Structure formats: C-alpha cells, structure tokens
Amino acid sequence: MATTHLLYLHGFRSSPQSTKARKLEARVREHRPQVHWWCPQLPASPRAAMDMVMQGIARWPQGAMAVIGSSLGGFYATFVAEATGCRAVLLNPAIDPARDLGGYTGEQTAWHNPGERFVFEPHFVDELRSLRRGPVARPENYFAVIAKGDEVLDWREMAGRYPGAKIKLLEAGDHALSDFDRHIEEVLAFLDLG
C-alpha cells in the first residue's frame, strides 16, 4: 500500500529545522503534496516524545503510514515501526541511546538554535531503556542508510541491529549524512509515497 502519511523524527539536540528534515519536507511537498507530512519538535523526555508521537499518529492509517528517523530519531522510529507495523527509514540510527547519552545529562543547547536550552534529566536515560525493543519483527519494513564514517555511532552496531533489512552502507560519510541529497530518491522510493 502506498504511503499517505509520513512522520520524520529528528535526533538528540536537533529539530524540524535539520537539513535532512527540511530537504525531505521540500521534496515531499513539491512532488507528493497529497502526502501528510509531520515533523514534530520532540521534547527532551523520551517517554513524553513517544507519547506525543503515538497520540499524533493514533488516527493515521497504519497500513499507509511510514516513519523516517535520524540518529536518536532512528531509535524512536524503530519503536514506532514495531508498535504500528509501518515501514521505517533509519538514517545513522542510534542503537543504545541509554548508553550513549548517559554522559549528556544536564543542560544542553539546541543544535539549530544555540540560544535555546533544555535539560536532559538523568531519569531520561531510564526512559530510553524502557523504549528499547528486541529484534525487529519485520525486517523487510526497514531501510537503513549507514555511514562507515559516522564519527558519533559505530556503523557495525547499526548494521547489526537490523539483520534482514535493506541496508545501504556508505563507505565514508559522516553522522549528519552531509551527502543526503544523493540518497533522498532511494529513501522516498522505499516508502512508496502515494
């Protein structure tokens, strides 16, 4: 079934103003204006973020929705895809954010607006642990774009988390996927936008 509703989930300290989110939104609005696009600003609390997302998509047609997530958003996208059975595209997805973000508790600045501050509370690490899911139920619903040159996350761990999924392993690249323009069409083709 073609995707009629598309959710984009940004990463830690990121926002709907990320380069990837803006490029995807522009492409969807230009070429598939009938597709419902939603890229919310996620709260710092993982539990609050997932509660907001799950409420926001509660009336979406599960067979015709998809999710894209970058970094921590990829972890969240896996949670959403496992809960709904939808397709998911993961862009350098975080695999164990409870481990990786444990050292980032306290006040943080927003990546796209350094004047904006938020607090990443210690108990948010436990919330991340509670959102972790086991092996994915339907690996054919997943497409991961993973850069071996990611300076933040281990590409081997990312690739190993999604056995049986479609994986595009980039020989170089970086965590931000600075060459994302080269991958947009493949991402959107996987999602079969209606």
Residue positions per predicted region:
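Active-site phosphate/pyrophosphate- and oxyanion-stabilizing loops and adjacent acidic/basic residues
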Residues: 22, 26, 78, 156-159
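Short, conserved beta-strand segments within well-ordered enzyme catalytic domains
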Residues: 36-38, 66-68, 90
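Aromatic pocket-lining residues of Rossmann-like dinucleotide-binding sites
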Residues: 80-84
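The alpha/beta-hydrolase serine catalytic core
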Residues: 87-194
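Gly/Ala-rich beta-loop-alpha elbow adjacent to hydrolase catalytic centers
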Residues: 68-77
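Internal catalytic or translocation cores that form aromatic/hydrophobic pockets or channels
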Residues: 59-65, 86, 91
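Active-site catalytic motif of lipid deacylating hydrolases and related acyltransferases
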Residues: 2-63
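Short hydrophobic segments within beta-strands
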Residues: 8-12, 68, 145
